[in-house]
Amino acid sequence: MSGKQSEEFKRTEKMTRMEYLFPVRFAVGWMFLDGGLRKAVLKPAKLDPNSASFVGGKLVNFLPHAGPFKGLLLMTLENRSLDVTFLTVFSYIEIIAGLFIIIGLLTRLAALGALAMSVGFAPAYWLGSTCEDEWQIGALLTAGSVTLMLTAAGRVWGLDYFLYKKLGDRPIANVPILKWIKLW
C-alpha cells in the first residue's frame, strides 16, 4: 500500500469509528429535545403553576435530597414566578441542546450543557421520586454527554464538519481547563 493509500485508509477508518457515535449523538440529543418539547410545546400545562400537571411538583419532592442546590431550589419554590421562569428556561435549554446535538452543531458545547443538566439533576435521578428507573436515564445521559463532549462526534454527519473545515479547532475560552474543550 502506497503512502497516499495508507493515509486515505487511516482517514477512512477514523471516519468510520466516528460514524459509530451518530446513534449516541442522536439518542442523547433526542432525550433532551423530547424532554424540553414535552414541557414547552406538547403539554404547556406542565409549565402552568395553576395546572395539576405543573412540573414544579417534582421539585418539591426533590427538595429534601437537593444537597448543595437546596438553597437555590427553596428560593425558586418560594417564588412562583421564579419557579415558572426557571422551568421554562430549563425546558428551552433542553430543546436547544438536544437540537444542536442531533444536527451536530457546536456539539461539544451543547454536550457540555447537557452534561451540566444531567449532573445537576443527578440527585433527583437517584431519588427516583417519579419513576423507579430515572437513575438509568440520568446515568446514560451523563455518559453519553461526556462521550460527545470528549469526541468530535459532530464532525461526522453533522454541521460541525463545516465549522471545523473552515475554522479549525476553537476552544471555549483560553482558560486552562476550558481550552481543552473545543466548540466543535
Swiss-Prot record:
Entry membrane topology: Multi-pass membrane protein
Native source species: Acidianus ambivalens
Annotated GO MF terms: quinone binding; thiosulfate dehydrogenase (quinone) activity
Primary location recorded for the protein, binned into one broad class: membrane
Gene this protein is translated from: doxD
Reactions this protein catalyses: 6-decylubiquinone + 2 thiosulfate = 6-decylubiquinol + tetrathionate
Transmembrane region(s): 21-38, 86-106, 109-129, 137-157
Stated pH dependence: Optimum pH is around 5, the pH range of activity varies in tested buffers.
DNA-binding recorded as keyword: no
Protein name as annotated: Thiosulfate dehydrogenase [quinone] large subunit
Subunit and interaction comment: Heterodimer of a large and a small subunit in a 2:2 stoichiometry. TQO may associate with the terminal oxidase formed by doxBCE.
Protein's job: TQO plays a role in sulfur oxidation and is proposed to couple sulfur oxidation to dioxygen reduction; caldariellaquinone or sulfolobus quinone seem to serve to transfer electrons to the electron transport chain terminal oxidase formed by DoxBCE.
Keywords for the protein's UniProt record, in alphabetical order: Cell membrane, Electron transport, Membrane, Oxidoreductase, Quinone, Respiratory chain, Transmembrane, Transmembrane helix, Transport
Entry note: thermal dependence: Increasing activity in the range between 20 and 92 degrees Celsius.
Lineage of the species this protein comes from: Archaea, Thermoproteota, Thermoprotei, Sulfolobales, Sulfolobaceae
Known regulation of activity: Inhibited by sulfite, metabisulfite and dithonite.
